[in-house]
Design a protein with these regions (language model features):
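Substrate/ligand-engaging "lid" and interaction regions
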Residues: 1-5, 11-385
């Protein structure tokens, strides 16, 4: 029996990665700290993925079990697995690194020479590399040597909208039909597993940045502009003509940067942008703007979805007025229930928009972006409200 360990039994874990692995013939063990979800998976031994699109479909996922990720039993589960995946959020990766390291150590002690591949399926660049660095800190020299020989850590790019829709059954999940899972081919240990829906990629960074600069950029700007106008959901926000125009223009600006850097076909990429915007309008996937816009400090960092597209585009002399409006809107994201929003609003009030952006994105002195962002911060308030 092929076995996969999926850290994170949340909506993404169940509705995307876990479902893909189960359909590929793996017994999927969900590892999570949510005891209610763990108990429900073990009780029901299955859940339904509701694919909501112009044509709706229900898919049953049944070859599954679950374990509390703090349970020592997890180490043996990892010792018996061929693949470990995560969908827990970037900030949680260091917290699960110890459990993964313990599982790797169990494999070493048991003399397991079958390769294990660990893939962090998170919204971030090189998430698996970050996880690997954290895992290695929990291994001694012998464990690190074993890990380098038998454990692969391929980076990946994932794309599927899985909104937090409440169902009668708490482990059923709603998803869109579209998904992409691009995984770094060269980083696998052993043969690349044949998993329908997983694309082994030779130029992963291009796929990572295409997704980051398109879906993530557009999603975030839609959320921040929608919040400024009082909308509650992404589909409401993108249906506003003014927001739609800014978001599409911003995605085209980031797209021109991608075309210049990676040689994507311009027309094909612009068609991809239109497809992404079409996904935002899906009435079955009315994602909350507060969920999509959460953690604005992270989203405003130099390597993330708002600032990095601007930095990339300017390398090729491409103007980014609408991307800058997105940064300005992010600085207006005022959500008292989001600690990063509270910190950002206080920082902007204390330092001013330009200095706040410079500090958040850790930009060098003299970089022109903070001043441009400050202008956009004022302009977006004038034109959007």
């Amino acid at each position: 029996m092929k076995k996969a360990i999926q850290f994170g039994a949340g909506n993404i874990g169940r509705g995307f990665i876990g479902a893909v692995l189960e359909k590929a013939g793996y017994h999927v063990v969900f590892a999570d700290v949510n005891e209610q979800i763990v108990d429900r998976i073990n009780r029901d031994k299955g859940y339904t993925v509701q694919i909501m699109d112009t044509v709706c479909e229900e898919v049953r996922i049944t070859d599954i079990s679950a374990v509390d990720s703090r349970n020592p039993e997890l180490a043996q589960q990892i010792a018996e697995a061929e693949i470990v995946t995560t969908a827990v959020g970037l900030t949680i990766l260091p917290r699960i690194a110890g459990a993964i390291a313990t599982g790797i150590e169990a494999r070493r002690e048991q003399g397991v020479e079958q390769p294990l591949n660990v893939i962090a399926c998170e919204n971030g660049v090189r998430a698996t590399s970050q996880l690997k660095a954290a895992v290695l800190t929990h291994l001694d020299a012998a464990g690190q040597t074993y890990c380098e020989q038998y454990v692969g850590f391929p980076d990946c790019s994932v794309d599927r909208i899985v909104p937090p829709v409440k169902s009668e059954n708490p482990i059923d999940v709603v998803v869109e039909r579209f998904f992409e899972w691009n995984v770094e081919r060269a980083a696998f240990k052993g043969a690349v597993p044949e998993i329908p829906g997983m694309n082994p990629a030779d130029n992963l960074i291009a796929y990572i940045e295409r997704k980051l600069f398109t879906l993530n950029t557009g999603h975030a700007i839609t959320a921040y502009l929608g919040r400024m106008k009082g909308y509650m959901t992404i589909c409401q926000s993108i249906s506003d003509e003014q927001i739609h125009a800014v978001v599409k223009a911003a995605m085209r600006e980031s797209g021109r940067g991608l075309v210049a850097r990676y040689g994507f076909d311009r027309d094909a990429h612009f068609a991809y942008i239109d497809k992404i915007i079409g996904r935002f309008t899906n009435p079955y996937l009315c994602d909350d703007v507060t969920r999509v816009g959460r953690e604005p400090l992270r989203k405003l960092s130099a390597g993330d979805r708002l600032v990095k597209p601007v930095l990339t585009a300017r390398q090729y002399g491409i103007g980014t007025p609408n991307l800058l409006l997105g940064i300005g809107a992010a600085l207006h994201y005022d959500n008292p229930e989001d600690p990063q929003s509270v910190e950002m609003i206080a920082m902007t009030a204390r330092l001013g928009a330009a200095a706040a952006v410079a500090e958040i994105a850790e930009l060098p002195a003299g970089d022109p972006l903070p001043a441009l962002a400050a202008q956009a911060y004022a302009e977006v308030e004038r034109i959007i409200r």
